[in-house]
């Protein structure tokens, strides 16, 4: 039987060497240390504007509905692997109401835990070792982390204020796009707050179709 010392010596997968501690985790520690130092000198704390963490209560109706649902025995079993039909339909209705987009709740909607899970699953599904990925700069750090974990090659493209924080399509066309499988975009944009338009999405779709690139908007 393996001893504890033997287990502790097992090396993690080599791919983990390509990723570091999550960017925002590091930053929160830096801010905490900075504020502790400032507090020791009687100075005001630094206000963290880096993460949009909710600080308000959900609507009372939502809390009551959750409590009522939690008391129903049938709600504590494993759910469908593709999500409850009612939930998928609600997502489809929301997209239709807000964006005028028609989605098939059976084949075009997949409920997930959050963006990190979705980004990694998409990367695992479409990227082989050595495939290339277009990642925005500045952009959400998880795009690069997931790409490194699947051993893809990261190609960054710049987002500039003078261009409204949109991709520079002329610059993209000058890049070597051979082997690029995925282009990550993010609108409303993090961290700039820039919004997209129908024109931008139309250009992204056209760019993806012409170059055989999967456009993934987070």
Feature locations, PLM:
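N-terminal small-domain helix-loop-helix segment of the aminotransferase-like
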Residues: 4-8, 14-114, 121
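Conserved core of the PLP fold type I
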Residues: 71, 75-210
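Active-site glycine-centered loops adjacent to acidic/histidine catalytic or metal-binding residues
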Residues: 218
